[in-house]
């Protein structure tokens, strides 16, 4: 049994709810910071006197920070108590976003967004471990899903508010608001999450042993491949709606809301399903993803059904809490690094999906071809899952024969 598996919560029910709320609030802040840049692209370009494609580089700098920071900070912080590490990561995040708000030039902004992205994956990894550690064993994935719910709510509510604030006042105030939310998370976690003196301490080199586990790599690969279809469709959603469905540009924000609703449902469903089915929940979610992706091109022909389909696309986020919990189960003593690396895998999916979708569109297959590309990547995730099951059975058979 891993150190996240405790028979009973070590906090009161009231504190349990408040801790999960505080951890989700940190995810809410991160979600606003990650996604609001897209909605404020024009304002940032005007404020820094750069082109919108250059703002795209700013977005990429943040994503690069996530990929680099997730394993790096998990290894560096391995020897610290998780409570301390959580607090430091959110202070770091607040400072990174404050620096972004004050950035005077394009190159400074690139650096600030890279720095702001560094704590992203490590925070979600450690927050998920903390949420699981205070939960009964049969509610671990549900608790992880509630932490990740912050990201979905940010997409649903936070980003429209941040975009509105950036348009009415300045995009810099949106960055500053994220810093305030991050500091509120620090205060809430410090007030409600008690120290855990019996928590096992790790050594940085021991954390690296996570990558000696084939099941860790396979779980990360499922996320990087199987999750990319969602990003493939989402990245080209606006032009698909206007060019294929005939949706007026003024209604595009409704599509973002629909996607956010799906994300909220997915975060809840993914954790609930994994608590009941364990790793067997993953192929169920991937098959659902295949169905959703294959029906999207058909739904895109209807102004009504396309919004139903967009909600369904958002529910594909159910993979996140399922895979996050799977990594906790297979990482042995190197849980911090494995859990943090999950978000590096998701950012890989965020890069892979739009790239594959762009290739299909450029080849002349049309805007709705993103659905078929997404179905193919979900099938790829199923193949990786099958490989993981085969490898796990082979390992058990080998141990049994010894």
Locations of regions flagged by a protein language model:
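Helix-loop-helix hairpin linking two adjacent transmembrane segments in secondary transporters
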Residues: 106-108, 136-194, 240
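A late C-terminal transmembrane helix in Major Facilitator Superfamily
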Residues: 330-366, 374
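Conserved MFS/SLC helix-loop-helix module at the cytosolic interface between two early adjacent transmembrane helices
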Residues: 68-107
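Paired small-residue
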Residues: 92, 96-99, 107-116, 304-312
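Helix-to-loop junctions at the C-terminal end of transmembrane segments
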Residues: 70-81, 266-278, 361-362
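Helix-breaking motifs and short loop linkers at transmembrane-helix boundaries and internal kinks
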Residues: 49, 81, 102-108, 246, ...
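Cytoplasmic helix-loop-helix junction between adjacent transmembrane helices
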Residues: 112-150
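C-terminal transmembrane helical hairpin of 12-TM major facilitator-type secondary transporters
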Residues: 280-323
């Amino acid at each position: 049994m891993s150190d996240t598996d405790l028979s009973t919560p070590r906090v009161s029910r009231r504190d349990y709810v408040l801790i999960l709320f505080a951890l989700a609030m940190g995810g809410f802040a991160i979600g606003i910071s990650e996604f609001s840049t897209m909605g404020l692209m024009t304002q940032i370009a005007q404020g820094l006197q750069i082109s919108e494609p250059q703002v795209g580089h700013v977005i990429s700098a943040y994503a690069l920070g996530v990929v680099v920071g997730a394993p790096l900070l998990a290894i560096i912080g391995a020897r610290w108590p998780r409570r301390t590490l959580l607090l430091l990561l959110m202070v770091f995040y607040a400072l990174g976003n404050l620096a972004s708000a004050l950035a005077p030039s394009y190159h400074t902004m690139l650096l600030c967004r890279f720095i702001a992205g560094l704590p992203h994956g490590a925070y979600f990894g450690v927050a998920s471990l903390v949420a699981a550690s205070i939960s009964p064993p049969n509610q671990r994935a549900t608790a992880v899903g509630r932490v990740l719910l912050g990201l979905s709510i940010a997409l649903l509510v936070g980003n429209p508010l941040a975009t509105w604030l950036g348009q009415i006042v300045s995009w810099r105030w949106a960055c500053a608001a994220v810093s305030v939310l991050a500091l509120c998370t620090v205060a809430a976690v410090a007030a409600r999450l008690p120290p855990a003196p019996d928590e096992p301490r790790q050594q940085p080199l021991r954390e690296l042993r996570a990558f000696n586990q084939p099941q860790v790599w396979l779980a990360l690969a499922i996320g990087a491949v199987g999750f990319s279809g969602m990003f493939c469709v989402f990245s080209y959603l606006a032009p698909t709606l206007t060019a294929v469905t005939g949706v007026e540009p003024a209604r595009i924000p409704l599509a973002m809301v629909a996607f956010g609703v799906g994300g909220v449902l997915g975060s809840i469903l993914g954790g609930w399903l994994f608590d009941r089915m364990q790793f067997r929940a993953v192929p169920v979610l991937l098959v659902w993803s295949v169905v959703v992706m294959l029906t999207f091109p058909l739904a895109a022909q209807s102004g009504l059904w396309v919004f139903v389909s967009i909600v369904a696309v958002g529910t594909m986020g159910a993979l996140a809490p399922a895979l996050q919990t799977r990594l906790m189960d297979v990482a042995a003593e190197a849980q911090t690094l494995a859990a943090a690396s999950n978000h590096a895998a998701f950012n890989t999916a965020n890069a892979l999906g739009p790239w594959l979708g762009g290739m299909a569109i450029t080849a002349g297959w049309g805007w709705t071809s993103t659905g078929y590309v997404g179905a193919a990547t979900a099938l790829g995730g199923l193949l990786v899952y099958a490989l993981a099951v085969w490898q796990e059975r082979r390992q058990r058979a080998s141990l049994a024969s010894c």
